[in-house]
UniProtKB/Swiss-Prot annotation:
Residues annotated to bind substrate: 286-296
Cofactors demanded by this protein: Mg(2+); pyridoxal 5'-phosphate
Pfam families: Arg_decarb_HB, Arg_decarbox_C, Orn_Arg_deC_N
Modified residues (N6-(pyridoxal phosphate)lysine): 101
Listed GO biological process terms: arginine catabolic process; putrescine biosynthetic process from arginine; spermidine biosynthetic process
One GO molecular-function entry: arginine decarboxylase activity
Top-level taxonomy: Bacteria, Pseudomonadati, Pseudomonadota, Gammaproteobacteria, Alteromonadales
Gene label: speA
Name under which the protein is recorded: Biosynthetic arginine decarboxylase
Natural source organism: Shewanella oneidensis (strain ATCC 700550 / JCM 31522 / CIP 106686 / LMG 19005 / NCIMB 14063 / MR-1)
Amino acid sequence: MNDWSIEAARAGYNVTHWSQGFYGISDEGEVTVSPDPKNPDHKIGLNELAKDMVKAGVALPVLVRFPQILHHRVNSLCQAFDQAIQKYEYQADYLLVYPIKVNQQKTVVEEILASQASKEVPQLGLEAGSKPELMAVLAMAQKASSVIVCNGYKDNEYIRLALIGEKLGHKVYIVLEKLSELKMVLAESKRLGVKPRLGLRARLAFQGKGKWQASGGEKSKFGLSAAQILTVVDQLKQSDMLDSLQLLHFHLGSQIANIRDIRQGVSEAARFYCELRELGASINCFDVGGGLAVDYDGTRSQSNNSMNYGLSEYANNIVNVLTDICNEYEQPMPRIISESGRHLTAHHAVLITDVIGTEAYQVEDIQPPEEESPQLLHNMWQSWTELSGRADQRALIEIYHDSQSDLQEAQSLFALGQLSLAERAWAEQANLRVCHEVQGLLSTKNRYHRPIIDELNEKLADKFFVNFSLFQSLPDAWGIDQVFPVLPLSGLDKAPERRAVMLDITCDSDGIVDQYVDGQGIETTLPVPAWSAESPYLIGFFMVGAYQEILGDMHNLFGDTNSAVVSIEENGMTNIESVLAGDTVADVLRYVNLDAVDFMRTYEELVNQHIAEDERAQILEELQVGLKGYTYLEDFS
């Protein structure tokens, strides 16, 4: 690829669009991060950052967090709504509520809350969906009358804790998901002497499109039907507590790619709000829930991994619809709340790790088959000679298909005992040579060639064995086919010599990344610089800050990775603020009720029985170190 350039690299990996300006490729071909938007020229080279961490004793893989990205995401979303409110002369304000289920890590929650520390009136609250999350939120929420939204299924204890939150000075909205929860709230509030702030989750008829669309619509797991909502209103009237009903909540589903879906859902919910106001409810908060998407592939489309709108358009549509419908009903405009956790956290974290080895197809020269060889092999030789002699390009596809068919026949004949192992190996090499030659002759400009180019890219791709667990660090890539941008961290100033797929180190064939951002689309392989065992080859998995840590599992007992918090100072210096060690072998054994202390006793007994006395101390030390060691691979020498 003689026309390769840095611009070609940036376009090929589509960095400009999925990164939102936080990540880029330098003129030297290094992947960089610019976490502070106030100083876009202050960049950190991720390759050098990782090497510095390794020198400091932080083993790969390491999850790197950039808190300044969190700050920017919070403030940019609040700014978008503030501008929309001003544009449409909306008569209420906006509040951003962070649902901690997206990422409950202490550093993440604290940095989100700190992002508006300088504001006289912060526009931030927190959301909890379970008792453990509520306990965390009650302690971590900002002290001055902070808003807490309580979602999820509830028992009496959950409700009591939420009401205690009111006693502690918070504004706690208990969102009713089921009709039966109202009775519990009324009883517990009476016992505690606390007037509750109630919310309703409406089950809309409209259902957004996407992987999480089941969380919206009439068949959704959560929410109250129109009839159930009216029952709640009647029961509150009978209890003389209708003024406790202060919030309307709905949720269209996570990662809503199409802005028209958001607009339509908000329109339906706005009519719920106005109708409830006309029934006498004192609702003054309109909680649109989640749904604000993240453009994982950078295509700015309606695909499940993208979004066809920006922040301003998102805020404008919500504010515009609410303004129009409230004016139509002559009802006051409510405070707008959104629970946009994915948008806040996805970009801030990147997993950096190393390629520990590769496996590439070796295309070898072949000699013509022996005269007495089966006719099938002679046919394959003829296909190769026609191709290597540069046959008419119109015949390329035909030759390729013939070679594929011949290979399948050769494998079948071998299974029937009619072809020797050597003859099968020759057939496979002949097919490989044809594939390799055809790949170089096909043109992406020819639409008939494109499917075969994709097929050959996948067939001939190198296998990169990468030091991580897909199930621990990118569970959504395995579970729901989520796309995450993947990039080699250096060498991008040179044309990629290979295409590769990334395989993890678990003993599971599902441990493979099979979708990659490539230009304006998704491919099954990734263009990469050639791998060399002589120097570290680092890979970055981007946009893993939302859901991945808490959803990750311990398949093969690979545990949490090391992590670090990194920022850029005003003077441009890199600051590694904190490093947290990942799980040790003993840690993950403890998760499955296996005791490292018991293991050491067993090891000692076995060593005394089977190991010579002069070796015992060394062997026991190795076993002890193994239990204290990182669960990922560290020693390749």
